[in-house]
Amino acid sequence: MFVINLLLYIIPILLAVAFLTLVERKDLGYMQFRKGPNIVGPYGLLQPVADGIKLFTKEPLRPLTSSFNMFIIAPILALTLARTIWTPLPMPHTLIDLNLGLLFILSLSGLSVYSILWSGWASNSKYALIGALRAVAQTISYEVTLAIILLSIMLINGSFTLKNLLITQENMWLIVSTWPLAMMWYISTLAETNRAPFDLTEGESELVSGFNVEYAAGPFAMFFLAEYANIIAMNAMTAILFLGSSLNHNFSQLSTLSFMLKTLFLTFMFLWIRASYPRFRYDQLMYLLWKNFLPLTLALCLWFISIPIALSCIPPQI
């Protein structure tokens, strides 16, 4: 039974990732006054299938000077972590119900740094290594902000369990009372997933393609799938943390539909931002975090710690 549940959990994510690539290309096309993919299948709907077949049937090439084991392990690790991060998410039911679900997600997002670093190091290429170092510095930096924002949310929630967030937000979404945190969280997730305008790892003018420049065929497709799975997972997290999930014990299907619509809207915002904004300069990216976001999140965290004490009350669910 567990194997069936696992398959029912993995296959929809892979399908969602495949069609997200199509949606992105279509959206960018219409925003630039063109059609996007429209040849393969009706309205281009079979384009992700064609892309997948093409990538996984090509010969996986690698540089002669690369470190073979690490070169192969890096994309497998990236895809595995991108799939595992979904396990504690309540949609509204989880695959594995963890008491420390938020810490689990935070630790997995930290581990994803290793796959990027290994890929850049194992490629034995200057472009790949510089792209990997950029990605690692960016990801580790923004994880500081994400961790403090999560701590603030947990102080309001009174628990590290994700399911309790659904109960906390029964009357009002947390985005109403904590909109500065929600804004900084959303911008930080853009940086965490290396998306525009923070896609400094893929600066075409100076780094060709970033840390995955030496990858082709299957291993490249794994990195691609991992990136888009992380995008959907981060938006699912945003929906759970700040937009609730409209928990309805009688009609769980409605809860799932509500969660899906919120995640779809947030993911569409990712694509809209990509079409609208130019790439940041690297020093501006770091300045935004260390000089703006970090002091603000620390101040707000202290605020949420002091409010219950000042009002002589305790958070719910303790």
Swiss-Prot record:
InterPro entries: NADH_UbQ_OxRdtase_su1/FPO (IPR001694), NADH_UbQ_OxRdtase_su1_CS (IPR018086). It is found in: Mitochondrion inner membrane. It is a multi-pass membrane protein. The keyword Membrane applies. Its EC number is 7.1.1.2. The chain crosses the membrane at residues 2-22, 70-90, 100-120, 136-156, 172-192, 223-243, 253-273, 294-314. It catalyses: a ubiquinone + NADH + 5 H(+)(in) = a ubiquinol + NAD(+) + 4 H(+)(out). It comes from the Eukaryota. PROSITE patterns: COMPLEX1_ND1_1, COMPLEX1_ND1_2. The keyword Transmembrane helix applies. GO terms for cellular component: mitochondrial inner membrane. Its main location: mitochondrion. Core subunit of the mitochondrial membrane respiratory chain NADH dehydrogenase (Complex I) which catalyzes electron transfer from NADH through the respiratory chain, using ubiquinone as an electron acceptor. Essential for the catalytic activity and assembly of complex I. Belongs to the complex I subunit 1 family. This is NADH-ubiquinone oxidoreductase chain 1. It comes from Notamacropus eugenii (Tammar wallaby). The lineage of its organism: Eukaryota, Metazoa, Chordata, Craniata, Vertebrata.
